[in-house]
């Protein structure tokens, strides 16, 4: 849809501020959509109907990153991610985590997504959604924006709920794109 901004009279300062923030949000939305297009593909999203423990899950996801050419050293990457989780957990909110390695860099940036129908316990949280990130050494604006987006996901209860209800990878991608940072 098209965003509409209505005014009855000449704009006041607060109208101009609102309009500017709306334009900023639309630009952010476009940028976020572009980043999601680039980094989160359907074939890298897996819905797990059964219980999984974190180490087993991360190993499986690391192998997929390796098969897709994002990382070359599966074992090194996996152990690095586990170590990070032990010392600096990457929980965002109570249901989501974004594990990534401390020292091991990716050949190219890639993301594996796991949506669990049965939660697992991690640092006192019941986790259901895992975005495993393989990051190149050069951190760019896109990744910073992606982290901002992840932070926003967890603060939108309705949106988060919708994501967690996704039945399969198609539904997950569709729900992922239903975000509006405007709300």
What are these model-derived regions, one by one?
Residues 1-183:
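Cytosolic covalent-transfer regions centered on His/Cys nucleophiles
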């Amino acid at each position: 849809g098209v965003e509409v901004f209505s005014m009855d009279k000449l704009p006041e300062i607060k109208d101009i501020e609102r309009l500017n923030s709306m334009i900023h949000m639309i630009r952010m939305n476009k940028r976020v959509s572009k980043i999601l297009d680039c980094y989160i593909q359907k074939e890298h999203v897996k819905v797990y109907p059964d219980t999984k423990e974190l180490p087993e899950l991360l190993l499986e996801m690391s192998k997929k990153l390796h098969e897709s050419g994002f990382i070359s050293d599966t074992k090194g990457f996996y152990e690095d991610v586990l170590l990070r989780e032990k010392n600096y957990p990457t929980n965002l909110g109570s249901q989501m985590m974004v594990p990534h390695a401390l020292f091991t860099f990716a050949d190219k940036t890639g993301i594996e997504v796991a949506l669990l129908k049965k939660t697992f316990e991690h640092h006192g949280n019941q986790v259901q959604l895992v975005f495993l990130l393989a990051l190149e050494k050069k951190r760019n604006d896109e990744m910073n924006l992606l982290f901002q987006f992840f932070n926003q996901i967890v603060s939108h209860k309705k949106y988060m709920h919708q994501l967690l209800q996704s039945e399969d990878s198609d539904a997950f991608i569709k729900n992922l794109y239903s975000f509006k940072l405007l709300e």
